[in-house]
Design a protein with these regions (language model features):
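Positively charged
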Residues: 1-134
């Protein structure tokens, strides 16, 4: 999906009934794993708050988050990021550590802390959910 107007539209909450979107998103990330480490549902044309990412802290397993919301962050830094929806890289502000509330694939509430590269990936994908393009 490269429609900037669609990508700039904040996504709606995910819920029961979005299981196929989750599967499609995981499959799309798997198919693009050589050039992509995370995706949000709006990148496949679905305006739902669903993200998936490769979690290196879990041996490269794909993690699914529904309705993610970053609740705390620290350690701001400037970086360059790319995106499948855009050409080239762009400068952006990220945080070295984040705390996040989300729901797992079974819609159970979760809270977690992430740091480093994984935290950066999550921030990028949550931005997609919020209609923010780097």
């Amino acid at each position: 999906m490269t429609s900037r107007s669609f990508l700039r539209t904040p996504s709606e909450a995910a819920g029961p009934g979005d299981e196929q979107v989750i599967e499609d998103l995981v499959d799309t990330l798997e198919a693009n794993r050589s050039r992509c480490v995370g995706m949000a549902a709006n990148m496949i044309g679905v305006g739902k708050r669903i993200i998936v990412f490769v979690d290196e802290d879990l041996g490269g397993r794909i993690t699914v988050m529904l309705n993610p919301a970053i609740t705390a962050s620290d350690g701001a830094f400037d970086t360059q990021e790319g995106c499948l929806s855009l050409t080239g890289e762009r400068r952006t502000l990220r945080y070295r550590r984040i705390e996040i509330n989300y729901e797992d694939r079974r819609f159970r509430a979760r809270h977690a802390t992430f740091a480093g590269w994984t935290a950066q990936i999550i921030q990028h994908e949550v931005d997609h959910c919020n209609g923010i393009i780097i």
